[in-house]
């Protein structure tokens, strides 16, 4: 295999290539290259298509061709083969060389779409409006862009603060407590109380006694929380009178009524004592008389004659 020759073609090689193209046609480049020592099929094709073909125009580019190239480049970019198809007698290599050598300096940074050739319709570079701070991107892609000396005045360039993003990191051992659920009742609702009364008893009287008992229990509970002592039921002289009034309204023998009352009181006291022992850890419930208070274990109801 002969050594490949790199560099410009000589006039003798150009003449030999013309004769071979006439003989084999402008397609059999592998066969043609075998007759030209040191030249590959690709090199022969490019030399013919870009320089020696009769269809290639060697005259200077006209103003109309320059405008067509500028419009096409704004639309297609560096697709030189596509742009060359829009021109008669111009190859992609010729169009590319003409753009890089001449048109790029003239048209760089301009958008030629919609340009009709007149100076009035030539797009103008967008300038910074008065009073607004300049925007510096640091990227200048065209020769028409400002150089370093144009933006050397750092006093007019706003420095944007850097933004740091922090990713939340879960803390070890963190406990998420449930939100407390508050349940509130309407303050407009009237108080409702349920009480049991014997036949013939006054309902309002029983209601008053129920409210008094509720107030007494609230006072006892607050004293228990404050002093951390065993609570007592207050001894009141009206308790015996209330039972006597209930006994008078009971039909028949009063002894039967007192028996029923005693059983009810025993059951209530037993339940209360059990609850108190449970709250005090199973200890003894009792104590001394203090301010009219007596231990629950010493409360009893005698027979009323």
Swiss-Prot record:
Compositionally biased region (Low complexity) = 183-199, 213-222
Q: Which CDD domains match?
A: SANT
- Does the keyword field hold Chaperone? no
Matching entries from InterPro entries are given as:
Homeodomain-like_sf, Myb_dom, MYB_TF, SANT/Myb
The cellular location(s) given in this protein's UniProt record come to:
Nucleus
Task: Summarize induction of expression.
Answer: By drought, cold, high salinity, cadmium (CdCl(2)), salicylic acid (SA), jasmonate (JA), ethylene, gibberellic acid (GA), and ABA. The induction by JA is COI1-dependent.
Q: Which UniProt keywords apply?
A: Abscisic acid signaling pathway, Activator, DNA-binding, Jasmonic acid signaling pathway, Nucleus, Plant defense, Repeat, Transcription, Transcription regulation
Q: What is the top-level taxon of the source organism?
A: Eukaryota
Q: What happens when the gene is disrupted?
A: Increased defense responses against the necrotrophic pathogen A.brassicicola. Down-regulation of salicylic acid (SA)- mediated WRKY70 and PR genes expression, leading to reduced resistance to the biotrophic pathogen P.syringae pv. tomato DC3000.
Could you name the Gene Ontology cellular component terms for this entry?
A: nucleus
Q: Where is the DNA-binding region?
A: 29-52, 80-103
Question: What do we know about how this protein assembles, alone or with others?
Answer: Interacts with PYL8.
- Functional summary from the UniProt entry: Transcription factor. Represses the expression of protein phosphatases 2C in response to abscisic acid (ABA). Confers resistance to abiotic stresses dependent of ABA. In response to auxin, activates the transcription of the auxin-responsive gene IAA19. The IAA19 transcription activation by MYB44 is enhanced by direct interaction between MYB44 and PYL8. Transcriptional activator of WRKY70 by direct binding to its promoter region, especially at 5'-TAACNG-3' and 5'-CNGTTA-3' symmetric motifs.
Protein name per its UniProtKB record: Transcription factor MYB44
Species of origin reads Arabidopsis thaliana
